[in-house]
Each structure stands twice: as structure tokens, then as C-alpha cells.
């Protein structure tokens, strides 16, 4: 079984890498991290112009009509550049949830806005510490009205809309959870940015006060849909991490070749060689696993949750 990417995918990778090298150098990333802006707006517009935000969105809804393999390619380059934009929350989570469960009206309203960079989306799942589970979701939905708090919500302080997991039953089963789509700008939602260990990923607390919401998908199937979205997002985040690991390895190699000690590059010392070799093996293993995940994601294989 061949998990390698095609020549077309590699061409897409080269285009994405060139674009991000020009528009998202380390200096630009540092400007966002050290400044007051929560993301790079110019880069976000540029990604939309390149078609990267809508690469997995069908052409019917304003996207490129490609697929998840192409999105994996873009994800790796986003991680390599440490791009300070709400890409994962909007593309991996919100857009995928709408594609999976949204009505035709919801798809026609939000997907073109995502592809054009006019809308930022997120998934409001967590309600404090701990792993996500149906039991951990307590925010109630009554008559499509939400009241409660979600935190942390990735990029919640800058999001235009959110996919919200809420409780619609009390049986103690997974079927107690349903998904809702909330237009944050329409009112009924207070967003407060949270202090985060990783400044490249904004987190927020969203407070819903008699907030009107639209059901996203059938009532009682929210947890099943969330699980599918998270499984796919895990693969895409893995590609971002592989991209970052590869770039770190390249930087370490270059430093080892340039740094002189005792009259020769430190890369010539056996201890440094061993360190770089171990890094390479770890990065290659991660890449292999990610490629397997990309295959599972693109074919909807049963192995995906694993």
C-alpha cells in the first residue's frame, strides 16, 4: 500500500510553502505573538485568495472542491510556518461540522463565507478541565435556546459563529447531546479572551444568555457527529505537528553545520549526530503515522478513530 502523495499534491505543497515563506516569516509570527492582534488578518485574506481556506469545501459552496488529502498537505505547511491564524478552528472543526451535518441553507450561508475568509468559526465543546465526553457536557438547550458557559473555546474571542454541543436529554446516554449553530454576532453571546500558555492559539470563554441557536443535524446525534469531526481534526493537527517538527529538525541541522567549536562544526561531533538522528527517526515515524491517518480520512476507513 502506497501512502505517498501524488505529484499534484507535492506541487500544491510547494505552492503553499512558497506562499507561507513569503507571507508568514518568523518575524511576522513574532509580531502577532508580541502584539495586541489575535491573528494575522492579511495572512488570513491571503490564504483565502489562494483557495486554501476552502480546499475541502465543494465548489457548489464556493470552495476549491478538492478533498482531505489536499487539506492534509496544506495543514503540514501551516504547522511548518506556525501560521498565526484561526485555521484549525475554522477549517478542521467548524467547516467540517457543517459539511457533515448542516442543512442546505446552513451550508449555503456559512461555507462560502469560510472559503472567502469572511467568517471565522469554532467548536464550543469543553466546559472546563478534562477530556471531552457526553457526561462532561452540561450546557442545556431548551427550545433552541442556550444558557451556560463553554471554555476553553479555540479562537472563540474572534469567531463569527460557533458549533455548540449542548444537552437535550437526561437519559445518561450519548443521545443526550445535540449540536447547534450559533451566530455569535447576532447577540446573546459574551466572549472573553483567556490567558493561554500558547499565545499562537487564542482561547476564550463563551457565555450564552438566552441565545437563539439553530439545530445542526438531527437531535440526539450530536456526540456521534462531534466524534467524527474530532477524529478528522486529529489527523489534520498531526500534519501540522509533523510540519513543525520537520522545520525544527532543519533548523537544528543548519545550526549544527554553522556553529563552530574547537575548530570544526558541532555537527561533526558524534553526540550531536546521535541527537539529530534520533530527531529524524521520531519525525519520520510521526510522518508515517500521519500519512496512514490521511489515507483513513480521505477514504472514510474504519481505522480512522484509531
Q: What do these predicted regions represent?
A:
Residues 27-35, 253, 257-264, 280-306:
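C-terminal helix-coil-helix/basic helical segment that borders enzyme active sites and/or dimer interfaces
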Residues 9, 20, 74, 103, ...:
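Residue-level signal for inorganic ion chemistry
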Residues 139-142:
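A structural signal for short hydrophobic beta-strand segments in well-ordered beta-sheet cores
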Residues 27-49:
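Short secondary-structure junction/hinge motifs that connect adjacent elements
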Residues 48-108, 112, 116-117, 154-161, ...:
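Internal helix-loop-helix
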Residues 2-8, 12, 80, 189-285:
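Glycine-rich beta->alpha junctions and the first turn(s) of the following alpha-helix
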Residues 117-127:
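A short, Trp-centered hydrophobic/proline-enriched beta-strand micro-motif
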Residues 124, 149-190:
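A short core secondary-structure module
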